[in-house]
Amino acid sequence: MSNRKYFGTDGIRGRVGDAPITPDFVLKLGWAAGKVLARHGSRKIIIGKDTRISGYMLESALEAGLAAAGLSALFTGPMPTPAVAYLTRTFRAEAGIVISASHNPFYDNGIKFFSIDGTKLPDAVEEAIEAEMEKEISCVDSAELGKASRIVDAAGRYIEFCKATFPNELSLSELKIVVDCANGATYHIAPNVLRELGANVIAIGCEPNGVNINAEVGATDVRALQARVLAEKADLGIAFDGDGDRVIMVDHEGNKVDGDQSMYIIAREGLRQGQLRGGAVGTLMSNMGLELALKQLGIPFARAKVGDRYVLEKMQEKGWRIGAENSGHVILLDKTTTGDGIVAGLQVLAAMARNHMSLHDLCSGMKMFPQILVNVRYTAGSGDPLEHESVKAVTAEVEAALGNRGRVLLRKSGTEPLIRVMVEGEDEAQVTEFAHRIADAVKAV
């Protein structure tokens, strides 16, 4: 069990100006990371960021810390998280660092690391960095200080990588696509990828100003995208989150297509093409309709804990190549090393182009079960509501009523005193009533 002080499951994250996302902390983090990573040989670190205004401050602090430890920084400027993973691999850099808080508001930010092979840093390396942070900063000799430079063609390199994951024999020339880049890191990447593959592209959420990232746009709020798809009579819409590792789509009727549905389309197409190896990994929150649809195709399905980190771990454990969260993280290990919204979106588009089918029709083989989520706040320190007999009794009653055509999932939030009550089944009215019945039991504790 890890007892890390700063690193969570997705790096270090928080509100800018509050510990730990402060200039002095991030400078020391850069120094500590530099001290640990310098032991491994290479002296280059890739640094990318999303479009938050605080990214300028934090990349400068990181660079100063790395330089003091004798490592050189290569800046990409605003760049999707998966692009930093890719560039870290191709530059043979010792590590990649992403400054982003993903789908969070602009006033949050975070730092996460990739290893030389474009995967998450091992826990042992993160723990070594934390241990180094307990020491006083010491500067290497002046002749050994790190330098800083910019990768001027970073965007072009990543655009070509993305295009290479789309089959050469196919084209997007028959598609009108609305793309929503969340005023985030994909704003100068995704529209160009789609246009160069032949699509007629209408771009929204592509005017970042430092404070509008994820603000009523992007994968976490597709209302603007849905409206624009309908207004433009487009074939579909594609939305990314602030750092480009999630993708949510919208069909020509304005219906939202989530990560579960995208994985279903990609897995089914892989099966048809004889390219699917093993099964598919979802999470505890994956829709039961996904599990049943994959079962009908004979594709094995396994659930991991919520979090793309745990999806990847389960994929590696089973030797499978595809995994996803319903929030839009889709991991395709035959294509890349981490969740990549653009690459995942391209595989769905390839299925559309190859089969001459609409996104709506590709989704039709999977019946989504109504899934009701209720958040219940409880008093921290007052005991665990999930262990209370009354909550257990009501949960058991609901599970018995649903039988094998539904699910109940109760879990604590990892960041605040909330119990998340999820009930899933075939009848939306019944599922809603069941979810509120359990939520009321939790509130009464």
Swiss-Prot record:
Q: How is it modified after translation?
A: Activated by phosphorylation.
Query: Which Gene3D superfamilies is this protein grouped with?
Result: Alpha-D-Glucose-1,6-Bisphosphate, subunit A, domain 3, Alpha-D-phosphohexomutase, C-terminal domain
Q: Which GO terms describe its cellular component?
A: cytosol
Query: According to its UniProt record, which cofactors does this protein need?
Result: Mg(2+)
- InterPro entries per the record? A-D-PHexomutase_a/b/a-I, A-D-PHexomutase_a/b/a-I/II/III, A-D-PHexomutase_a/b/a-II, A-D-PHexomutase_a/b/a-III, A-D-PHexomutase_C, A-D-PHexomutase_C_sf, A-D-PHexomutase_CS, Alpha-D-phosphohexomutase_SF
Is Magnesium found in the keyword set? yes
Key words, A-Z:
Isomerase, Magnesium, Metal-binding, Phosphoprotein
Please name the GO terms that the record assigns under molecular function.
magnesium ion binding; phosphoglucosamine mutase activity; phosphomannomutase activity
- Phosphoserine sites (modified residues): S102
One Pfam match:
PGM_PMM_I
- The UniProt entry annotates the active site at S102
The record describes how the cofactor is bound as: Binds 1 Mg(2+) ion per subunit.
Signal peptide start-end: none
Q: What is its EC number?
A: 5.4.2.10
Q: Which residues bind Mg(2+)?
A: S102, D241, D243, D245
GO term, biological process aspect, one: carbohydrate metabolic process
Family affiliation:
Belongs to the phosphohexose mutase family.
- What is the name of this protein? Phosphoglucosamine mutase
What organism does the UniProt record list as the source?
A: Shigella flexneri serotype 5b (strain 8401)
